[in-house]
Structures are given as C-alpha cells and as structure tokens.
Amino acid sequence: ADRGLSGSFNANVLKEAQNEIDTFGKENIDLFCIGKKTRDYFTRRDYNIIESHLEFWNDLDFQHAIKIGENIINHFISKNVDEIHVCYNEFVNVATQTIQSERLLPLEYKQDDNPSNADRLYEPSKEKLTKSLIPRHLNVQMWKYLLESYASEQAARMVAMENATDNAEDMIKNLTLEFNKARQASITKEMLEIVGGAEALK
C-alpha cells in the first residue's frame, strides 16, 4: 500500500514476505516492490530492489498488471533468478484478509493435471501455445494479485476507521461522564459552602 490508516495491513504482508525471504537468504533475493511501504521497508534494510511500482492505485487497471508481469517474466527468462514468489493480501470478506505466498514461476503442475498418457494434437504447436498462453496467464495472475490487495487494503482501512470511530465514541462517553461527575462535585461543594456560610451568620 502507499498509504497508512489501514491497521496491520502493511505489517502483516511485510512480515510474511520477510519470513519467505529468510528461508532463501537475503543475498539470494531480488525484489519487485509494489507500494511505498514495501519499498521503504526493504530499502531501509538494504535489499536488492529491481523495481518499485508506486502511486498507481487510484488509476489501477490491467495495463499496470501487464507492465509488472512482463518485467518479472523477463527477469525470470534472463535466468537472473530460479523462482518467482508473490506475497499478497487475499480478500476473503470485509472483516477478513489472509496473507498468501505463492510461487508464480516456474509453473507448478499437479499430478492429476495429466490424467492419461493419450496423444494430443495441438493447433498451433504446443510451443506456440505455450509462448502465447503463459504470458497471458501470468498477466492475469498479476492482475488478480493487484485486485485482491486493493480490495483487502480498502476493507482493512474501513475496519480500522470503524474501530477508530467506535473508540472515539467510547472516549467521548467516558470524558462526558467524568465531566458531569466533576461538575456535580463542584456544584455540591459550592452548595455546601453557601450553606456553611449561612449557618455561620446565624
């Protein structure tokens, strides 16, 4: 995220990213940072940041996902890294966002993805299909990550603001009660002083 006021939204995903990084070792990591908070966090810790993408959330569209996705794919194809992992906030509902860490590249295939050994005919060729479909798939995945994160951020901010409002209302009630007690005590004291003065004059 670029802004605060969203509770533990940023802290949670940064913690997960840090845990993920620790398993590989700082010296083996290249980072693509999305959002100011992420960039600032890893800049302060002197990580190798390849790219930072900032201040596009108000104009979020699929082109941003394509741009980020293409750069990440090129970094992988150039054999600068062996794997690409993504840490993001998954939107479940307004009250719940979960931290996810997924391996984006290389693609993972489940055993049951190929249930039979039957020959298949690919038109165009398998290689052409792969070259065409994989970038599209990765761009859609990147778009999904951005949308999930954006929805999670707005939900976290809404919950944080609602909690802040509730806390402020509770504080107002408590302060009003304290004020009324102090006011009543002051009035009682003044009345006692008046009565005491009147008794002294008798």
Question: Predicted regions span which residues?
Answer:
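C-terminal beta-strand-loop-alpha-helix "lid" module of Rossmann-like NAD(P)-dependent dehydrogenases
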Residues: A1-K202
